[in-house]
Amino acid sequence: MLSKDYIFSVFIFSIIFSCSKPPFFMDYLNFDGQWPTSEKVVFDIGTSTDQPVNLMIYIRNNQRYPFSNIFLIARLKTGDSLLLCDTLEYAMTNAQGQWLGKGFLEVKESKLWWKENYELPTIENLNVQLEHALRFNGSEKSM
């Protein structure tokens, strides 16, 4: 079993208008040095907007994360209705093993695009759920 110490310390979700206006929604969660692999992250957005938005995920990590990429399952929901579900893969390092993202010292922040110019449905009680999609080879169970 892998140690939980390698998981990200901060998780940020942002919905930004396509026209570079201030964010429609931006929130973050701090973890005590780790994001438990069994824990879903939930962001309650509330109401939507009638303008297309960019859905982005910001992740801060350090050298304790032992992988060169990350797999996430991202869901956009309202109540029990699933509006959008994607399995996402993002590179976290370049080919030489150097961290991607911005920052100095050991902490790097990566801006990960989920959807560009996405038209949110005009409904209330929207939320975004993010969870790890890392799997051991040949297993359906998450790490």
Positions of PLM-derived features:
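Bacterial signal peptide processing site
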Residues: S20-P23
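Short coil-to-beta strand junction motifs in C2/discoidin
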Residues: P66-L72, S142-M143
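Post-signal-peptide N-terminal segment of Sec-exported extracytoplasmic proteins
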Residues: V41-N69
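Short acidic/polar inter-strand loop motif in beta-rich domains
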Residues: N62-R64, E109-L112, E131-E140
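C-terminal motif of bacterial Sec signal peptides marking the signal peptidase cleavage site
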Residues: I16-S18
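Noncatalytic modules at the cell exterior or secretory-pathway interfaces
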Residues: D50-I57, Y118-L134
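An anionic, turn-rich surface loop/hairpin at beta-sheet edges
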Residues: L88-E119
